[in-house]
Amino acid sequence: MKSQRNGLAVDRREFLATTGGGLLAAAIPAAASVAVAAGGGAAPSPGTSGRAQTASTALRKIPIGVFDPVYDDLSLDEMLDKVSALGLEAMEIGTGGYPNSGHCPVDELLQDAGKAKAWKKKFEDRGIQVATLSCHGNPVHPDAKHAAKDAETFRKTVLLAERLDVKVIVGFSGCPGGSPSETQPNWITYRWPPEYAEMQDWQWKEKVIPYWKEAAKFARVHGIRRLAFEMHPKFVVYNPRTLMKLREAVGEEIGANCDLSHLFWQGCDPVEVIHFLGKQGAIFHAHMKDTVSFPENVAKYGVLNFAFDTGDLPQASETFRAVGYGHSASLWKSVVKAYMDTGYEGILSIENEDPILTGAVGVERAAYVLKNVRNELLGT
């Protein structure tokens, strides 16, 4: 059953999820105040008592930006005009792999320094920072051609980042097969029966760590010391523990793209995660994307039951939503505060994969929530 609000079809489950009893921002028109969406207060999430501090002008005004695939239907200039009109201050730009490179002609910019300068100037003329380049792929894929293609995309992205003076590259850790003979990735999260432990150990020792040691060395030579891995299911780095495992094995060039949408359903406390990683200087980038949980389906099917399409929602345990449509604005205020408290130096990059809201609307709604909670924290 769907209802109409603000001209949009909204699935009934949009109203079901709560955070500490607070209403979702989804249940409030976009023009309503964040204070109302937050249920009248900005209480920290569970497990964060004692961390609350009064807003201070010393807190950094973290730039709010957007990841460009949501605007794949627009030209570069059209996209930049749209982003500027929204008052966003930064962008994450795809350079290949899963995000593609629709707004960034990588080879052309590498071949011609003048074209690279002109490309970047389009952003600068609108007051938009090119904050990160993103090449999400699988450079340790068991298919050699697939792995080589994604590894080459990473290499070119490093060279382009050097040319553009961009300091952060975002991507995935990748996932190998479970043995030399496998032809597809094998995501192993449970070390039993014993052969799974053997396969997982082989993946890390023979594929993941050797590749990223060499890749980090290459990046370091070209002045890039921040490789931000999205902790994403189906890749070997999928939570804070596996991220730190790779960082400890490879070096401090490895850090997080902290996309909480992949951690909510795993049961992580978002503020706890930010403090845990942030205190170690291990957060290099942050995706702003929400997840809504449908308790009646979690009770029946468990959490490994994610939906990406609207047709799957009636049986889904979770799906992605725009910021504020899965958790209350007060929770997101605690999240932004945690980034400020831990000295995070990156941007808040809106990524829209909401199956209900269109891309443009999802970005606008997320930007509205994030701007308001940031302003409340800064007292502006």
Where are these regions (language model features)?
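C-terminal segment of N-terminal export signals and the immediately downstream linker at the start
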Residues: 30-65, 69-72, 81-82
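Short, acidic/polar
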Residues: 73-83, 149-158, 268-276, 332
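Glycine-rich, proline-tolerant flexible connector loops at the mouths of alpha/beta enzymes
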Residues: 94-118
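Acidic/histidine-rich catalytic cores of soluble enzymes
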Residues: 61, 90-91, 133, 192-326
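N-terminal secretory signal peptides
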Residues: 1-11, 36
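Active-site acidic/histidine proton-transfer and metal-coordination neighborhood
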Residues: 14, 19-32, 51-58, 78, ...
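Conserved, mostly hydrophobic/aromatic
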Residues: 66, 83, 91, 123, ...
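Catalytic domains of carbohydrate-active enzymes, especially glycoside hydrolases
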Residues: 79-97
